[in-house]
Amino acid sequence: MISEIMHPTKLLKGTKSKLLENKKILVAVTSSIAAIETPKLMRELIRHGAEVYCIITEETKKIIGKEALKFGCGNEVYEEITGDIEHILLYNECDCLLIYPATANIISKINLGIADNIVNTTALMFFGNKPIFIVPAMHENMFNAIKRHIDKLKEKDKIYIISPKFEEGKAKVANIEDVVKAVIEKIGNNLKKEGNRVLILNGGTVEFIDKVRVISNLSSGKMGVALAEAFCKEGFYVEVITAMGLEPPYYIKNHKVLTAKEMLNKAIELAKDFDIIISSAAISDFTVESFEGKLSSEEELILKLKRNPKVLEELRRIYKDKVIIGFKAEYNLDEKELINRAKERLNKYNLNMIIANDLSKHYFGDDYIEVYIITKYEVEKISGSKKEISERIVEKVKKLVKS
């Protein structure tokens, strides 16, 4: 009866993205102490939509138990080859093999074609046919001793070595995020299809007074990151242009800029390949003529500001048919005036949607805010966390795109 109930791990599936949706990943665990991190890795793969299976060597059980690994992946854990010919069954079923952690022993045997346990036997099934990701973990001396095997494997088709971190005389297993990113890059779903591509402008830009000092603002970048995560979770392809502030997670492509001019140029360059453009960035309205070197602080200084081009205005001028969404931040206005000013911006730049907020109520960096989501046809007031508000914006954008 209990076997018919869905394993709780399955509830995590796709909670971050659909980048690995419908992908089946076989995780092979060998006897490095880094094996204790494997359940975390499995669950991160699942959060991106993957179905995860697991095989282990006999020695692995001295480091981590089968039940812990079953907890991690939500499926049975295999430790030997039986009459069910598990190495063939799992090869046929799975899209790739991920050996995490990979010991010196297992790496050497795979390169030499030795098949004396379920892990290296299964690896030989995948060898040259489907992707194999190898994540070494061992003492640095051992890594150097088997480097010839690693170098040989690197030359093979469809084998990817995810480099360890060399610290304290050890070749420590790569970060889980780096491992998942590598898997996504090689076997992840191509979500970049027409109607599904979102470009987000995020963070606060800076304008240089000299080579050291800048004029900027207090934008945290949290809203843009929350939006990026929310769109990604719903299966959109997302890229972010970030100035100062929080950057998006590892699985979302990020482009770094600093100034308003850089933000504008990068947005114009990238926007041609996107369907939806959202600017939650606090982009400098003014720039200043920058001085060479570092100005002396001994004398008073008068700065002459000049207007920057409006990024949304320029994007709309160039890209007339794209969905463009802006944000409008004001300070200490009553509700009617805030909405009116946001509507003026909406109409002036011919935006599809604008999100307005009053910074006197919730300042830069606050996690809980109150906003007005405004289109040409409706105004919706919503309060909540930036995560909750982002999810609501995504819902409304999905309806907007369909209409």
Swiss-Prot record:
Residues 1-197 are annotated as: Phosphopantothenoylcysteine decarboxylase. Changing E167A: No change in PPC decarboxylase activity. Keywords: Decarboxylase, Flavoprotein, FMN, Ligase, Lyase, Magnesium, Metal-binding, Multifunctional enzyme. GO terms for molecular function: FMN binding; metal ion binding; phosphopantothenate--cysteine ligase activity; phosphopantothenoylcysteine decarboxylase activity. Residues 198-403 are annotated as: Phosphopantothenate--cysteine ligase. Changing H139A: No change in PPC decarboxylase activity. Gene3D superfamilies: CoaB-like, Flavin prenyltransferase-like. Its cofactor is Mg(2+); FMN. It catalyses: N-[(R)-4-phosphopantothenoyl]-L-cysteine + H(+) = (R)-4'-phosphopantetheine + CO2; (R)-4'-phosphopantothenate + L-cysteine + CTP = N-[(R)-4-phosphopantothenoyl]-L-cysteine + CMP + diphosphate + H(+). This is Coenzyme A biosynthesis bifunctional protein CoaBC. It comes from Methanocaldococcus jannaschii (strain ATCC 43067 / DSM 2661 / JAL-1 / JCM 10045 / NBRC 100440) (Methanococcus jannaschii). The gene is coaBC.
